[in-house]
Amino acid sequence: MDIREEFLRFFESKNHDRVESAPLVPDDATLLFNNAGMVPFKSIFTGEVPSPANPRAVSCQTCIRAGGKHNDLENVGYTARHHTFFEMLGNFSFGNYFKEEAIDYAWEFITGVLKFPKEKLWVTVHESDDEAEALWLRHVSIDRIMRLGDKDNFWQMGDTGPCGPCSEIFFDQGAEKFSGPEDYMGGDGDRFLEIWNLVFMQYERSSDGTLTSLPKPSIDTGMGLERVVAISEGVSSNYSSSLFMPIIKKVETLIEKEYVYATGASYRVIADHIRTSLFLLAQGVNFSNEGRGYVLRRILRRAVRHGYLLGFSEPFMFKLVDTVVEIMGGEYDYLAQKSHSVKEQIELEEARFFKTIASGIELFNAELHNTKDIFSGSVAFKLYDTFGFPLDLTEDMLREKNLKLDSAKFEELMQEQRSRAKAAWKGSGDEAVHGDFKELLEKFSENSFVGYESTKQKSRVLALLDESYHHADKLSAGVNGWVFLDTTPFYAQSGGQCGDIGELNGFAKVLDTKKFFGLNLSQISTEKELKVGDEVEAVVDISRGEITKHHSATHLLHAVLFDVLGDHISQAGSLVEASRLRFDFSHPKAISNEELAEIERRVNYEIMRGIRANTEVMSIDEAKKSGAKAQFGEKYGDEVRVVSFGDASIEFCGGVHVENSANIGSFIITKESGVSAGVRRIEAVCGNAAFNYFSEQRELLREVEHEVKNLDILAGVARLKSNIVELKKELHDAESCIKTDIKIQSINGISVVVDELTSGDIKEKIDELKNQHESLCAILFQVKDDKVMMAAGVKGSDAKAGDWIKHIAPLLGGGGGGRADFAQAGGKDISKLSEAKIEALRYITEVIS
């Protein structure tokens, strides 16, 4: 049985509209990820936007809980039911049906469709909810209904806002499987498994805690697909179901070790985390050191560390992608489409971590010998900063040893990096905007945009908002606010294209244009008093023409990238302005100069072809069949606007464009760079900006000709390079003539050197010292280009140079190693050089004593 599909069809038969799963990255600045089925409907529940025409909805929402308030990460792999990624089945009523229907529908689906035995089902209700108990008594006996308090059976979105009691449905998995002290109804054991939560949103909580009844109560329900699948398949752990076992079996095959449930936590962690990693990467989230990308990095590195425990020593997670696609690709077709690029990104990230994981674990284990109860915060910071161990990974390792972390010390050392920590929400949206948008929608609906046809329009002011987005009857001269016009030529920021600027002739300057819940609002700075009802002439700034050139060029660039680099390319972000364009896209490696030249040539070829732009509004199904590219995560209605340039490019797009590709003029790539792992960025200019770029480059060329004193620049540069080589040789010869005093001491008959070299080559000096001494332990340091280089040599002693370097390098923020007789490394923390020299002497003294 396809439980996901059965659930959706069941509620469609009850007149619910099927709603596709929203992207994991929510349209909500207060959340890192969609973590519940109701999140996409939050603005409806809070009243920010009106209810849809059909106030009944059903969905299967992909969710992630791995950060913030809802964080299941540390439990994953160690319990039968926790996941970082899961699917939430839910049915919703926006002021339509209430408790009776919600309870009846749930009972009918569980017992009628899923065929779960009625005698296995238990329910809980809020201790004050007599109505829910009475409704449940029509289905179950009173001895299988439990009343609980606010902690378990009262749900609220926040400190204020919609809230209400809830009723949870539990499945008894049997005393024969679970007989622990917590395996009773209401306990924390796994015998009684919560499968469905019915939330009855019937109150509004005010700031003083007062509850007021809502005029139109609503229903929000959530049922975990993974739990229901496990029960239907007769297994007592989600990980033993068909959603996870094929992944675990693949891990077994790769590592050639049999999975045993009792000791298989690492297998389960890997199976869970590869699902999360695949979905996030396929939806455009990429590995980074901040925000959502850092959560993704933490999850993958946690899985890699568990793989390391199993015996993996090289990338393996990427080999699991195809297995997940086989399980889930039928429902989420984008997984297969993105699998190639996702595998490349995962393999690269794994390879990065495998380079440091052994050294990091060695440092961790070394510190364990010095730890009784509290693990050093300094070492935890070093693991984080030097070896790439996320803090929760270190805490995970400590939990296995029943140890705690000196968190205060770790936080103290993190102060230098607080700017990064504060940016952890970068890319997750601006602050949540609250204002009188619902009233505008209910009163006027969306306004009319005529900017495709005209850049000038006589309009009437329907509404004004102050800077806090609240109603104003008028705006005085010299203040900022927002205007809502009945008809507007101003394009609202969307799809990477910046919002239009311009003026309301004689009244105000238009500073920006944005969309709020479908409302096209322009930010203005008034020049004289502006009132609701005023007639104005809205004029778009002339810079719009340059914006259209860059926007159309972005479309052509996107298509060319697909042809030149491969069909794994997908847009990861864009910016279109009057003076430049920026396009981010998935690609696992830097683009070669030859590829860049070909991309630039191909885009200019399409420009010179003079292709007429064509715009059509069609159904979303027609648009997809036409091959038009859509951006993942964008919300599209039943009808979409498709912009095409002949056979060169076809995309979903609501933006403004040139009429003919020839109007773009020319296209110049100014920069190619990496944004994060697996994401590249191309920056380019067109039109007037391209002419200005050419002019600047020509002037720069003239300046270089003057500086190298040669009209043939390459010949001039070659001459300068030759001079530099000669000067370097002279400098080296001079340094060789300078006698360097090295401090040598004798310990147990062995010559020991721990010193800093200011000039010369430290490796050559080590060799020279070896030739001068029968038995030697020497380590030399040298500061070069804001880094510390170090080399160690051993002769006639049991000490090992490689071990010496491995011990000292981390103190300087570096790493390295080598043979027993010679080793070298580099570090980036010059401030710790004195400390490193002291420790180097202490270490070697202990070894040879």
Swiss-Prot record:
Keyword Repressor tagged: no
PROSITE patterns in the record: AA_TRNA_LIGASE_II_ALA
Binding site for Zn(2+): H551, H555, C653, H657
This protein's UniProt keywords: Aminoacyl-tRNA synthetase, ATP-binding, Cytoplasm, Ligase, Metal-binding, Nucleotide-binding, Protein biosynthesis, RNA-binding, tRNA-binding, Zinc
Signal peptide: none
Reaction catalysed by this enzyme: tRNA(Ala) + L-alanine + ATP = L-alanyl-tRNA(Ala) + AMP + diphosphate
First-level EC class: ligase
EC number assigned by the record: 6.1.1.7
UniProt cofactor note: Binds 1 zinc ion per subunit.
GO molecular function, one term: alanine-tRNA ligase activity
Compartments where found: Cytoplasm
Pfam families xref list: DHHA1, tRNA-synt_2c, tRNA_SAD
Cellular component, GO annotation: cytosol
Gene Ontology BP term (one): alanyl-tRNA aminoacylation
Co-factor(s): Zn(2+)
Highest taxon above the source species: Bacteria
Domain notes: Consists of three domains; the N-terminal catalytic domain, the editing domain and the C-terminal C-Ala domain. The editing domain removes incorrectly charged amino acids, while the C-Ala domain, along with tRNA(Ala), serves as a bridge to cooperatively bring together the editing and aminoacylation centers thus stimulating deacylation of misacylated tRNAs.
Protein family membership: Belongs to the class-II aminoacyl-tRNA synthetase family.
Primary role: Catalyzes the attachment of alanine to tRNA(Ala) in a two-step reaction: alanine is first activated by ATP to form Ala-AMP and then transferred to the acceptor end of tRNA(Ala). Also edits incorrectly charged Ser-tRNA(Ala) and Gly-tRNA(Ala) via its editing domain.
UniProt name for this protein: Alanine--tRNA ligase
Organism: Sulfurimonas denitrificans (strain ATCC 33889 / DSM 1251)
